[in-house]
């Protein structure tokens, strides 16, 4: 099993989209690569903690490769916009690929380079090692499964 953390705006939609992909073993939403230990949702939304809303993903690479997973991720974000996805604005809504395995870095860089060809503007999606990930409050986990009519900036149909 492999792991990666992806930030693509509001984590509710990212988790729901990713969880529908064959080969995904586990997802959980949380706060990645910020400055405060174990922040609350309110603290993250204030922008002071510098965390990104993100989705931790465990996947079976015999079913889906990291390259395929990243291609799906690129399809649901606008990687040229900083601190905004859909109607959501703030540093917590920035896009990012946070890796746990250093061996994944070359593939991530290659994927980002390929994606650049689709845009005239520069890609601002962060690519960094995962420095920290704090699981979000329980009511955020599987939010759109619990609240099917809930807000989502991603077209899930």
Curated annotation (Swiss-Prot):
GO terms for cellular component: cytoplasm. InterPro entries: Met_Sox_Rdtase_MsrA_dom, Met_Sox_Rdtase_MsrA_sf, MsrA_MetSO_reductase. It catalyses: L-methionyl-[protein] + [thioredoxin]-disulfide + H2O = L-methionyl-(S)-S-oxide-[protein] + [thioredoxin]-dithiol; [thioredoxin]-disulfide + L-methionine + H2O = L-methionine (S)-S-oxide + [thioredoxin]-dithiol. Its EC number is 1.8.4.11. Keywords: Oxidoreductase. It comes from the Bacteria. One of its GO terms (biological process) is cellular response to oxidative stress. GO terms for molecular function: L-methionine-(S)-S-oxide reductase activity; peptide-methionine (S)-S-oxide reductase activity. The active site is at residue 10. It is an enzyme of class 1 (oxidoreductase). Pfam families: PMSR. Belongs to the MsrA Met sulfoxide reductase family. Has an important function as a repair enzyme for proteins that have been inactivated by oxidation. Catalyzes the reversible oxidation-reduction of methionine sulfoxide in proteins to methionine. This is Peptide methionine sulfoxide reductase MsrA. It comes from Clostridium botulinum (strain Loch Maree / Type A3). The gene is msrA.
């Amino acid at each position: 099993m492999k792991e990666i953390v992806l930030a693509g705006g509001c984590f509710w939609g990212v988790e729901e989209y990713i969880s529908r992909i064959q080969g995904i073993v586990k997802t959980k939403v949380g706060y990645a690569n910020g400055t405060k230990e174990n922040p609350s949702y309110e603290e993250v939304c204030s922008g002071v903690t510098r965390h990104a809303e993100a989705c931790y993903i465990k996947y079976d690479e015999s079913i889906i490769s990291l390259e395929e997973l990243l291609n799906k991720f690129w399809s649901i974000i606008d990687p040229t916009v900083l601190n905004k996805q859909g109607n959501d604005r703030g540093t917590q809504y920035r896009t990012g690929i946070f890796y746990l395995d250093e061996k994944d870095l070359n593939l991530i860089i290659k994927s980002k380079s390929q994606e650049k060809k689709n845009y005239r503007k520069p890609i601002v999606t962060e690519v960094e090692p995962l420095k920290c990930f704090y699981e979000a409050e329980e009511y955020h986990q599987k939010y759109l499964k619990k609240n099917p009519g809930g807000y989502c900036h991603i077209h899930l149909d």
